[in-house]
């Protein structure tokens, strides 16, 4: 049984996806007069992918990010949620989530891969059975496209929010390469890369990453990335996207050779600079240092199922409805 698939386009872009977690674990961007550059974090073996606790490249669900209070509430109903010990919330679907499952191959060609998963009623604590499909495709011109589809079965509504948790390192340190610096070898720090966001608001968060208020303007503050600038700080932050035709995010390498434009149909973006990557990849090959890459996670705002008043589309799926969203990653290499 194949556990890894490779997709290529006519321009030389190449990606790899694993059955485990429907995980996007490699992306090689063609450059002029140079070998293609690996821009994703990944591991040398499948055992490391299974061992890591950083969701590296994985498809996350049923709910990406956090749900507060260890239960899901709607009206008079409540459903206890699975969670890691010691947390006051469920994170990324909890233990044994979609990121830790072997997905079923539905379709594979040179330019496209489609994987499926059945999530039964009560899975992770969520009501209703959910049939999920994730499609990776390379339509050309440096684009990696991820399409999510989920259909809910049963008598109860359920919030659905899937994302991909790839970590980007556009300077090509994605396979254990190191750069020489004072005092010996060091890893490239993603905080010196340039980021621009199409986000005029951000969600205040507490120390657990849960909402500490309503979305607020970023204008002139530390979270104002509407103009391109160095990341410059640790981030594990939810931004409200402005929408429209402009990218949700633009990331650029330090050497200026690679840029990424991210487009999404989802209403928010979690930006995480990987400041817990070292403990989360302990025992993996390689073990990634903190701040060695950034995750750009299109999704709903944290704890959205309990906040229908927020300025975004409804995250609750009714029985028989289909949840469909698209992330589009356009790489520019030169």
Segments the model singles out, each with a brief description of its role:
Residues 1-334:
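An exposed, glycine/acidic-rich loop-and-rim segment of catalytic or binding clefts
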């Amino acid at each position: 049984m194949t556990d890894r698939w490779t997709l290529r386009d006519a321009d030389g872009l190449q990606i790899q996806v694993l059955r485990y977690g429907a995980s996007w674990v490699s992306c090689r961007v063609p450059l002029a007069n140079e070998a293609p550059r690996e821009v994703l974090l990944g591991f040398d073996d499948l055992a490391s992918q299974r061992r890591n606790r950083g969701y590296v490249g994985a498809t996350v669900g049923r709910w990406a990010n956090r749900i507060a209070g260890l239960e899901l509430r709607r009206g008079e109903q409540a459903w206890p949620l699975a969670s890691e010990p010691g947390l006051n919330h469920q994170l990324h679907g909890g233990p044994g989530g979609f990121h830790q499952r072997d997905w079923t191959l539905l379709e594979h060609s040179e330019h496209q891969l489609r994987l499926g998963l059945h999530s039964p009623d009560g899975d992770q604590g969520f009501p209703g059975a959910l049939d999920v499909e994730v499609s990776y495709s390379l339509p050309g011109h440096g684009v990696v496209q991820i399409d999510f589809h989920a259909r809910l079965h049963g008598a109860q509504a359920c919030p659905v929010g899937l994302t991909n948790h790839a970590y980007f390192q556009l300077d090509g340190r994605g396979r254990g390469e190191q750069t020489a610096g004072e005092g010996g070898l060091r890893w490239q720090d993603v905080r010196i890369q340039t980021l621009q966001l199409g986000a005029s608001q951000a969600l205040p968060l507490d120390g657990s990453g849960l909402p500490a208020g309503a979305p607020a303007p970023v204008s002139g503050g530390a979270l104002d990335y509407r103009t391109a600038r160095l990341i410059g700080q640790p981030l594990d932050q939810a931004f409200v996207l402005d929408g429209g035709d402009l990218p949700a995010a633009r990331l650029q390498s330090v050497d200026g050779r690679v840029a990424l434009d991210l487009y999404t149909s989802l209403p928010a973006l979690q930006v995480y600079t990987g400041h817990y990557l070292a403990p989360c990849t302990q025992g993996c090959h390689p073990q990634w240092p903190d701040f060695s890459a950034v995750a750009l996670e299109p999704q709903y705002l944290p704890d959205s199922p309990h906040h229908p008043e927020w300025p975004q589309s409804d995250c609750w799926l009714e029985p028989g409805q289909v949840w469909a969203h698209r992330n589009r990653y356009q790489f520019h290499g030169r």
